[in-house]
């Protein structure tokens, strides 16, 4: 007791907060709940039962460290009941050399969502050739629940080795949905999406849309950093165009108020989600069932040690429990 009181005195002057620091997204209701003790309530998402509203967003797919990182991620998903999207599976589409790095079903278990991932450029080639059998084999071999399609026109344009699209991605996606029976998620890669793209996807029978919004890892910028100085200077402003997760959530809500037939009814809110408070706020603001995803945060800790990764997820889950008890989101703007 004496030590605690001494700490309070020593730290009091360091703990003053300014009005500019207040988080105006929430009402704080300290009288209305007891401290949360039990775990989060389980819920259905992507056809599986999850125990926390957190998604491991697709990351790197073909590096020397990918195997250990991926297995750490799958292990933590199983421990806490999260879902997971693999990084690009292109390295194992035709060659099994790196397959063990992606073979995670036994690690994550059968009860949680686990998705393969390919770029729209690879999908376009197969759709135009009327042969998606390599994708079917990939999903079956991985025992994945379905496919994430990452749509990345700016990245492909800026990438020296990039593939230029011969038709609008929405046409490729629409045709692929007619050819496959597997669930499909569509995501961007760090720019987010505007209203016309979101509207088009909401009208398709997708399992979910993942935002991959502006504010997180930006793969257009990644490609610029790989290029020469002149290209970086000339095309640099392109990487600053996009939509953050807050804007995209409101765009989706506005589209839902329109008189359209919505077939895609689940959202993974990702891109710039720096804390559990960001995720909690946006999944509660969204009118569709939603969870939140992170990529770089998981990558950081998964590449260090499992203990660090476990603590990272544990604190997020505890934070969501705290938020459920005491924080109510405001309808007003930030």
Identify the meaning behind each predicted range:
Residues 1-18, 232-265, 274-334:
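Alpha/beta catalytic cores of nucleotide-metabolism and tRNA/nucleoside-modifying enzymes
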Residues 1-46, 50:
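An N-cap/entry alpha-helix motif that binds or orients negatively charged groups
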Residues 29-91:
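N-terminal functional module of multi-domain proteins
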Residues 54-57, 82-88, 114-118, 145, ...:
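Hydrophobic faces of well-ordered beta-strands that scaffold small-molecule active sites
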Residues 58-60, 67, 82-167:
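Active-site beta->alpha loop and helix N-cap motifs at the rims of alpha/beta catalytic domains
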Residues 99-117, 165-185, 230-263, 316-319:
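Alpha-helix-loop-beta-strand connector modules within alpha/beta enzyme cores
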Residues 129-137, 191-211, 251-263, 269, ...:
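Catalytic cores of alpha/beta
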Residues 143-171, 197-198, 204-254, 297:
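Glycine/Thr-rich beta-alpha phosphate-binding loop at enzyme active sites
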């Amino acid at each position: 007791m004496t030590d605690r009181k001494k700490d309070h005195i020593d730290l009091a002057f360091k703990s003053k907060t300014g009005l500019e620091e207040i988080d105006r997204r929430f009402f704080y209701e300290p009288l209305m709940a007891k401290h949360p003790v039990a775990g989060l309530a389980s819920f259905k998402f992507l056809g599986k039962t999850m125990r926390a509203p957190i998604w491991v967003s697709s990351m790197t797919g073909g590096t020397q460290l990918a195997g250990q990182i991926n297995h750490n991620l799958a292990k933590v998903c199983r421990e806490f009941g999260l879902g997971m999207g693999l990084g690009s599976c292109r390295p194992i589409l035709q060659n099994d050399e790196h397959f063990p790095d992606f073979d995670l079903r036994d690690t994550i278990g059968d009860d949680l969502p686990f998705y393969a991932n390919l770029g729209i450029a690879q999908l376009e080639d197969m759709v135009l050739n009327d042969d998606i059998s390599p994708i079917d084999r990939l999903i079956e071999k991985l025992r994945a629940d379905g496919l994430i399609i990452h749509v990345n026109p700016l990245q492909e344009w800026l990438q020296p080795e990039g593939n230029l699209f011969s038709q609008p991605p929405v046409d490729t996606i629409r045709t692929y949905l007619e050819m496959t029976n597997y669930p499909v998620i569509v995501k961007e890669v760090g720019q987010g999406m505007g209203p016309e793209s979101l509207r088009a996807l909401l009208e398709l029978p997708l399992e979910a849309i993942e935002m991959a919004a502006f504010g997180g890892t930006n793969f257009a910028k990644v490609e610029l950093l790989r290029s020469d100085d002149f290209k970086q200077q000339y095309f640099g402003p392109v990487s600053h165009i996009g939509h953050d997760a807050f804007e995209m959530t409101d765009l989706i809500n506005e589209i839902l108020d329109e008189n359209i037939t919505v077939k895609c009814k689940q959202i993974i809110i990702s891109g710039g989600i720096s804390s559990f408070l960001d995720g909690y706020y946006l999944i509660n603001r969204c009118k569709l069932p939603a969870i939140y995803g992170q990529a770089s945060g998981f990558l950081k800790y998964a590449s260090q040690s499992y203990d660090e990764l476990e603590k990272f997820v544990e604190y997020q889950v505890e934070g969501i429990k705290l938020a459920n008890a005491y924080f109510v989101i405001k309808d007003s703007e930030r």
